[in-house]
Amino acid sequence: NSQGGTIILGNKADVDNAVAAAKEAFKTYAKTTKEDRLKLLSNLLKITKERFEELAQAITTEMGAPITMSREAQADAGIGHLEGFIDALKNSKDREVLSSGDTILREPIGVCGLITPWNWPINQIALKVIPALAAGSTCVLKPSEYTPLSATLYAEMLHDAGFPKGAFNLLHGDGPTVGSAMSRHPDIQMMSFTGSTRAGTSVTKDSADTVKRVTLELGGKSPNLIFADCDLEERVSGSVLECFYNSGQSCDAPTRLLVERSCYEEVLKIAKRTAENQAVDEPTKEGEHLGPLFDKIQFDRVQNMIKVGLDEADLLVGGLGKPEGFEDGWYVKPTIFKDVSNDMRIAQEEIFGPVLVIIPFKNEKEAIEIANDTPYGLAAYLQTGDSEKAERVASQLRAGAVHINGGGFNYGSPFGGYKQSGNGREGGTLGLEDFQEIKTLHF
């Protein structure tokens, strides 16, 4: 929790200057060929691999992810998403003739405003900056003001890759000043935002007067359905660890464990044992342990929600305070509540920490009803040994992604949510298309 450095926050004048640079660069960058942009992306891939360790260390320093996790997931996203977008661009069609004889052109949308969060800094930067530039658009990036190190490093990498002056612009600043000025700016044609639902609503409102395109990736309270016919030991322990991953600071974390009553007691035993065995340690150490929460604000929020949980439900493991031996830093005990009802606050509100709630269900129909009883719809998870049931249940879950029996996210696949978890999709072909306009030629 010590200070790692200082940055200068921008203001509205800085936004105007950055947008002007992006607007001027768009005049020529939009005319580059797909081959030109593929070469630039290939250069960026080479540089990202060369500076990979720097990227991982920066993320660990600025947001506290354990260094092993920073390498295997946080920094790795900078490579994986880039490779996914390179494939998408290679396979994209700038020109397509319809059966009617009309021709569709896919063109860059223009100047894009990009706002990214602190919890997965390079993951989100890559999901926005790369498709914008791949499409021939130019952009202004405002990363979280709390994680400037990886963003600054990424700006250096883009410069070294050869992207032209003004195509990419990095502007540090806060949301109310810089973020709002970007959203309101008449020369920004698109805003892409990742963060809280509250902040995403503000971006949408600020963007309304200029009728710009807005894509949002927001919060989640993802359900994880445990059916009695799955491998309980493997799938329950894996589910608990997935909830705790990144210290629970992931918008798609499976934080609601919905359990079939016939195996409920066995699941409680496995979940408790898994949480008790989950190590917590310093982020600079190698290993599969959990690091601290991001900052005091986040720590206080999580502690407050644990207090709420103690009033609402029964504590299975964990609780208030810091783990023994970790009084210095924003460490939290991995915590699980049992016998939770889905109308409780701990089942409805995003906690953003290593806190899991366990909710029993009696049958498949009730499981689906509970799973969908949330304002969010970013992801869902289900564990079953019956493949037909898996497809049947997945088709009824209102979420942008369904992870079945531990199936993980693959680079190049679309990511995004239903309901108040946002709109638009990030990653691969669909993520590229969000940064394009469609023009129809009638002959």
Regions found by a protein language model. Give the residues of each.
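Residue-level signal for inorganic ion chemistry
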Residues: N1, R37, I59, L82, ...
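Short, structured beta/alpha segment
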Residues: N1-Q57, T61, E233
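Conserved C-terminal structural/oligomerization subdomain of aldehyde/semialdehyde dehydrogenase
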Residues: S2-T6, I188, E324, D328-F443
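Short, well-ordered beta-strand elements within core beta-sheets of diverse protein domains
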Residues: Q3-G10, E24-K31, G78, L114, ...
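Short acidic active-site motifs
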Residues: D14, T177-V178, E366
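Long amphipathic alpha-helix in the N-terminal Rossmann-like dinucleotide-binding domain
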Residues: S42-E53, I67-S92
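Rossmann-like NAD(P) dinucleotide-binding subdomain of oxidoreductase/dehydrogenase enzymes
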Residues: D94-E234, F361
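ALDH superfamily catalytic-core signature
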Residues: R198-S341, I404
